[in-house]
Amino acid sequence: MKISDLPIKNVIASNDSLIVDNNGTSTQRIKATDLAFAQFAFLPQTRNQIIRGKSLGSAFTEWHKTEIKTGMFNDMFLGDYWEYGGVKWRIVDFNYYNSSENNAKNHIIVLPDQNLSRSAATSAENSTKNYCDSLMYNASASLKSRFATLFGDSHIMGHFDSFANDYGGSSTYPYYSDEALARGGIFTTLPDEIMLFGTHIMASNQAGRNANIHITGRQFAYFKCGAPMPTPTEDFWLRDKSWYNYFVCWRSYRVNQDIWSNQHGLRPFAAITGEPN
């Protein structure tokens, strides 16, 4: 019987299989659901455009490291995750810092699906302080160890970032001076509105604000593709300042703001490489 003699099927079910000629050495089959992603194996540039959401297991293996190191990212897509320590460590971008870092290694951006700890935004003696060196800044930096238990400390890439630093203002004129501090060697830190939503929503966009500068100007691809916020029932801080003593947060299923003294969750992200740094 010829293939052309077989009945035509217009819809493929998830458990259907297709025949694969394995380079002339054998005949194998592949499930239809796997074929949908396997066909992009040699097109790593598609990784920031496709959401899959598959479990990658509970260990960061040598195979994972090799695929990241080479920049091929085979069998890794947006939304894929490692489940370790009761947390889903989800891929939200590929090579995010390639446009802002000289000779950046191939990397993935990993954001946990839930809060890793809680903190006030800053302290009473610095109630109008900006994000840089605040309580939540330092607390997020200390959470590098949580990432290291899964990925290994040497695979967490330090990157340059831009943080709101000095602050001058009052409740009447909330921003008459502030500045952005470019700082290297950042391993784990909180995302801002640009990274999650692609634009400023609650953060002040007042003219003359140097601290509005953004290191890449790019939204994490996972959210750019329309993925919902993981575990939206949890509240957590973002690093943007919305008023002279208020910061942006996620709360009540939406972008919100809260005063510096209240505690919210911390969900820092990290850039993970395939080779040691």
Positions of the model-derived regions?
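Short, surface-exposed terminal/edge motifs of secreted or surface/virion proteins that either
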Residues: 1, 20-39
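Collagenous Gly-X-Y triple-helix signature in extracellular proteins
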Residues: 40-277
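Short, intrinsically disordered N-terminal pre-domain segments
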Residues: 1-15
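A ubiquitous, low-specificity "background" feature that marks scattered single residues
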Residues: 11, 21-22, 27, 139, ...
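Residue-level signal for functionally critical sites in structured catalytic/ligand-binding pockets
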Residues: 6, 16-17, 26-30, 267
